[in-house]
């Protein structure tokens, strides 16, 4: 890895998508975007991938729609064999590229690992995942081992103001109005 590339390695990596199977014989790949608008993944450059524990920068040469898929052509990936080597690689950028959000909006990555407590002080557990349901996002919370209700996992809707009362990213705490029995 060159020194120039080492300086550009993402300080705070965030996954924006994943490369899928190869398409055709000229090095095109399917891409699965995790951005809210699938095409937004192309707004964030440069892309990085990790291969054998080493960061590598990849350059997007072109992209287009093919049926329901998005397909990409990366610079230097010119045949099916080269494309196959990138299948399942996550597409990573530095989080500093992401736009600032308004009050009450959060990136999922920022909520991961936050401790969730009720307004009464009951510790519900830690956020381990998020789900998109269509109507609202849902926190997936891993309950503490000695949970008084014997619950291992909780699903709490991320409804700011209704269920979510306060998010404090500095202390990594989310306060909720939620019955611990659920």
UniProtKB/Swiss-Prot annotation:
Signal peptide: none annotated. GO terms for molecular function: ribosome binding. GO terms for cellular component: cytoplasm; ribosome. GO terms for biological process: ribosomal small subunit biogenesis; rRNA processing. Residues 102-182 form the PRC barrel domain. Pfam families: PRC_RimM, RimM. The PRC barrel domain binds ribosomal protein uS19. Belongs to the RimM family. This is Ribosome maturation factor RimM. The gene is rimM.
